[in-house]
């Protein structure tokens, strides 16, 4: 069992008429694919309803995380000195917020991606090739991810916000590995 009893209770005992808990057979990547498919095809929803995600695919969460970087950096002496952050990450959301904070002028010396055996981000940063590998279950299940959704947001920025180029890259990724030019 990958979910502790405490985690199970946190997920299943939330009270509220608008909250519906679902369990799936699969891993984080499988669940994330279902969520993305639901956002792409909302025909199952009544016309007056919409879907909202509170995980890192929601832009509002990324914006809130940017604030954490500024707060921590100021506490560490910024802007008079540069700061570095080491961030455990699987889905790239929190570290992407750090990247955006640096783009906004925060004096970030470096952002360090901390990962586990499911090291998709380490591999892409080291080889400029984005490819899937089999998922390995570890003691850090929130990092047990083979496709980092928010990495696509970084690519969008690095490719000068060219949505067509990113759509083509991600379509190619659906079929296999992708390699990046100098960006």
Predicted regions and their residues:
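PLP-dependent amino-acid enzyme catalytic core
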Residues: 1-183
């Amino acid at each position: 069992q990958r979910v502790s009893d405490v985690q199970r209770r946190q997920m299943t005992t939330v009270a509220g008429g608008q909250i519906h808990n679902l369990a799936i057979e699969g891993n984080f990547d499988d669940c994330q694919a279902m969520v993305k498919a639901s956002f792409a095809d909302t025909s199952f929803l009544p016309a007056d309803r919409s879907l909202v995600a509170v995980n890192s695919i929601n832009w509002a969460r990324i914006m809130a995380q940017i604030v954490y970087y500024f707060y921590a950096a100021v506490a560490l002496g910024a802007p008079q000195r540069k700061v570095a952050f080491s961030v455990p990450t699987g889905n790239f959301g929190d570290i992407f917020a750090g990247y955006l904070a640096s783009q906004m002028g925060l004096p970030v010396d470096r952002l360090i991606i901390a990962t586990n055996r499911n090291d998709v981000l380490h591999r892409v940063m080291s080889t400029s090739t984005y490819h899937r590998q089999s998922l390995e279950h570890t003691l850090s299940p929130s990092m047990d991810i083979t496709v980092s959704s928010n990495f696509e947001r970084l690519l969008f920025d690095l490719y000068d916000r060219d949505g067509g180029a990113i759509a083509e890259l991600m379509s190619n990724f659906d079929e296999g590995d992708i390699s990046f030019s100098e960006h």
